[in-house]
């Protein structure tokens, strides 16, 4: 006899949709508290199973990964945006693309990116005046777009920066889980969907313009875009410009926003915890002095590393991930039907008191070698895990640390909001602009 996971029955037909729309984060927390590590419910007509224990997560992402694909839920939601890019592609095509792109994120290549990251950060900070109030999350989104454009695609995004940032923001807002329209098909002409469609058209225009401009260059850099174009132009492959477009969209939308959020949440957490901030600043002074940070400096900055890790634990930019079972499966003592959508929330696991003492407090000092060795493998997974872990993990961590270090060398950040609140969009977005007053050090 099949034993389904426990969970809320919700309303007739609607199931748990309304409670999830009202407050996804509290809903996740309530499910874990009331029903445990494996919870089944109905959302928007789909069987959803929340899995929130590291042991089960490891089975899904690693041991039994062949039985859990990206699935129809993610493809319905994101297929328009990233097509067959790395985020959604499966099987041999995914494997070939992953192998093709992975060298662009090897350590040797990252070393070349580091100087550009610091240069772009200094250029952005040059626009800030001591004593002024800035919208930190917006500033950092513009910065990470500029960094990504220069390092991976070899172009200066200055002219299209605002358009790109607004487009990315509109697309992310389309997937705010707190809006009923998110669960409607994209072709239904709601105001949000119309804005989304315009943003998608803008995104395609910008991407194809970048491709055309690169092909017209006589002397182009050896970067990710060059690798992609060479693969498309190779007669031995079946790749097309649409494939190229999908991978560029995946990298841009998947990479710049999560990095900007990690930076935002690190800087605001430090601003609200003066003792932790003082420790990081003292470390930067001792190791760097007045020099710019380099990639070779990062191993000598453990307090900076801990500050970033703790911010990504407390406020994980990727707050959940999804999989779909492609056959009936057993998770723990429960049966999961074929076609169930699994939601694996970092939001719940990263705040679990079984793994993290005082889980809702920012405590970077917790990240000792002994503590990390004691953690279950998937108690902390800000970059997903298994063979489909984020391809840009090293790039994103290096970028976040270099940017945070560079900015702390120049400014103090006075957080202007009483506290942070969040919106569940494609990523963990601040519910309102993050205003900070910057003062030169």
Q: Where is each model-derived feature located?
A:
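Conserved cytochrome P450 K-helix/beta-meander segment immediately N-terminal to the heme-binding cysteine loop
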Residues: 66, 322, 344-371
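Cytochrome P450 I-helix active-site segment
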Residues: 5-10, 114, 118, 219-226, ...
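N-terminal membrane-proximal hinge/A-helix region immediately C-terminal to the signal-anchor transmembrane segment
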Residues: 1-96, 111-124, 143, 155-159, ...
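Cytochrome P450 heme-binding "Cys pocket" and the immediately downstream C-terminal segment
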Residues: 274-276, 373-375, 393-429
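Conserved cytochrome P450 K-helix E-x-x-R motif and the immediately C-terminal K′/meander segment
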Residues: 17-36, 291-332
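Short, small-residue alpha-helix embedded
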Residues: 258-271, 403
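Cytochrome P450 heme-thiolate monooxygenase catalytic core
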Residues: 70-75, 93-94, 109-261
